[in-house]
Swiss-Prot record:
Originating organism: Oryza sativa subsp. japonica
Signal peptide: none
Gene transcribed to yield this protein: MPK17
Name by which UniProt lists this protein: Mitogen-activated protein kinase 17
Keyword Isomerase attributed: no
Modified residues annotated as Phosphotyrosine in this record: 269
Length: 582
């Protein structure tokens, strides 16, 4: 056992006596009532994600803890949270008008809703696994939103890795040419890294190292497939109580092909400013590389170390000022690569700033961690390591193992031919339908044989949900509790072929961080869950995490008021720099 693994064990033993509140990270089931604890998120209003925060039930004790459980040690790693509790008796009708108990999924409650859809926590009755089901409403009202959904479900099908959120199933629509909504089933994650950072001021160096390792391992896989995520930030990294992380929200991701024009590749780039690489703050460099994601990883790592965003810029110019305040004035070589003349002139005329030693900026932090952080935050992208190179840094000695770091093959250009042409609504509908069939192999074979079936001979899951839960909606509207109507003589939905999943058990065993199952037991096909349904899906992205139960506006701190926003495109940014700082 390595030194860092031993230190985790000592930490666990030291905290053995600390008890965990009953309203922790777990889902507590008593009879028909389900009580779920939810985080208070920092709402990202400026990003316009469209989610309404649902406030139900009393506010929980802010000193309660989330239990990060190690089965080997039999102890808890306490992580503070400030949850709110949703009243389990109030099941929102918005979801159940379209969705309810079909043969496979037992819905427990609605856990999120917004302009783009509704999310429910459910149990897969075949496996006992807890899942999150997102119903995305009116997918094709806007072709741009539908294209983003198509891109994301395609990438999440092609990128299968333990550090990337997984789509488990997509329900077959009732009609090939007329469907409007889609139902996507995800593995259920409990929270996101933003909430973990915000709720904890006592994360250990082992946490920092473990989190960064998983993030870089995921990016190694993603970049090997020639994919750039383009929107990495703590809210787009899901987290579980066993300290496992998973990257989500691939709605802005792009596959890089050698013949992809830079102007086309970055036309719609609007990633969150605080985590945006300097070359994206003013169309700096003629060719973008995976180094844009590496910069974001560095910003996230710094936030893990300090508990605060590293570069919380109020606008693009302020963002550049914060970067140069820490990293110093860029070198002449770096400035020469800036293609926007006015942006280049602004930085060239900037007063000379010395580089701040990272030991001063981050006092008390492991020197090896700071050395790697400096590499990740190099101003010039050519000076940043690749994810694969970063994993060989001495900081990960005794932890990194290439056998646990699979890489993907580059994605075929044929998968993303749709990016090169203007799509009509019916085009996107057909492409999304084709992606859905990947989870219904029997129907896919018929489709590939040239079948032109417009509707299906057996009831689709969506049809059954509408029919079976009409009574539940009526009961909820009257303030009554209602149980889902049991299915009678409906055929089972087509099952997707189950592939092997990448395992990570050996790695967790080495770190003495045990795998915590998503359920304790299965009785009559329904699990008795241990975990809270915290991974909510926001906005037009189908996989991003969004917790509900927001703090009252007057209670938000100054940091929360500086919410990062989805910003201008690169060209607009250049013009803004020119106007403000000519």
């Amino acid at each position: 056992m390595g030194g860092r693994a031993r230190s985790i064990l000592r930490w666990l033993r030291h905290h053995r006596s600390r008890r965990v509140s009953s309203s922790s990270f777990h889902l507590t089931t008593t009879g028909d009532d389900t009580v779920k604890d939810l985080h208070d998120p920092r709402r990202e209003d400026a990003e316009g994600d469209g989610w309404e925060e649902v406030h139900e039930g009393p506010e929980s004790d802010p000193e309660e803890y989330i239990a990060l459980v190690s089965e080997d040690a039999g102890t808890h790693l306490p992580v503070r949270t400030e949850p709110r509790r949703m009243d389990p008796s109030k099941k929102e009708p918005d979801f159940f008008t379209e969705y309810g108990e079909a043969n496979r999924y037992k819905v427990s409650e609605v856990i999120g809703k917004g302009s783009y859809g509704v999310v429910a926590a459910a149990v897969d009755t075949q496996t006992g696994e807890r899942v999150a089901i997102k119903k995305i409403n009116d997918v094709f009202d806007h072709v741009s939103d539908a294209t983003r959904i198509l891109r994301e479900i395609k990438l999440l099908r092609l990128l299968r890795h333990p550090d990337i959120v997984e789509i488990k199933h997509i329900m077959l629509p009732p009609s090939r040419r007329e469907f409007r909504d889609i139902y996507v089933i995800f593995e259920l994650m409990e929270s996101d890294l933003h909430q973990v950072i915000k709720a904890n001021d006592d994360l250990t160096p082992e946490h920092h190292q473990f989190f960064l390792y998983q993030l870089l391992r995921g990016m190694k896989y993603i970049h090997a497939a020639s994919v750039f995520h383009r929107d990495l930030k703590p809210k787009n990294i899901l987290a579980n109580a066993d300290c496992k992380l998973k990257v989500c929200d691939f709605g802005l991701a792009r596959v890089s092909f050698n013949d992809t024009p830079s102007a086309i590749f970055w036309t719609d780039y609007v990633a969150t400013r605080w985590y945006r690489a300097p070359e994206l703050c003013g169309s700096f460099f003629s060719k973008y590389t995976p180094a844009i994601d590496i910069w974001s990883v560095g910003c996230i790592f710094a936030e893990l170390l300090t508990g605060k965003p590293l570069f919380p810029g109020k606008n693009v110019v302020h963002q550049l000022d914060l970067m140069t305040d820490l990293l110093g004035t860029p070198s002449a070589e770096s400035l020469a690569k800036i293609r926007n003349e006015k942006a280049r002139r602004y930085l060239s005329n900037m007063r000379k700033k010395p580089r701040v030693p990272f030991t001063k900026k981050f006092p008390g932090v492991d020197p090896m961690a700071l050395h790697l952080l400096e590499r990740l935050l190099a101003f010039d992208p050519k000076d940043r390591p690749s994810a694969e190179e970063a994993l060989t840094d001495p900081y990960f000695n005794g932890l990194a193992n290439s056998e646990r770091e699979p890489i993907a093959q580059p994605i075929s250009k044929l998968e993303f031919e749709f990016e090169k042409r203007k799509l009509a609504k019916d085009d996107v509908r057909e492409l999304i339908y084709r992606e859905i069939l990947e989870y219904h192999p029997h129907m896919l074979q018929e489709y590939l044989r040239g079948g032109d079936q417009m509707s299906f001979m057996y009831p689709s899951g969506v049809d059954r949900f509408k029919r079976q839960f009409a009574h539940l909606e009526e009961g909820v509207s009257k303030g009554e509790k209602s149980s889902p109507q049991l299915r009678q003589n409906a055929s089972l939905p087509r099952e997707r072929a189950i592939g092997n999943k990448h395992g990570d058990d050996e790695y967790h065993a080495k770190l003495n961080v045990g795998e915590k199952p998503c359920h304790a037991s299965v009785t009559d096909g329904i699990s008795k869950p241990l975990m809270s349904a915290r991974s909510l899906l926001k906005s037009e992205s189908i996989s991003a995490s969004k917790c509900i139960g927001e703090k009252p506006k007057q209670d938000r701190d100054q940091e929360d008021s500086l919410t990062e926003s989805m910003d201008e495109t690169a060209d607009e940014v250049s013009e803004k720099v020119a106007q403000l700082k000519t």
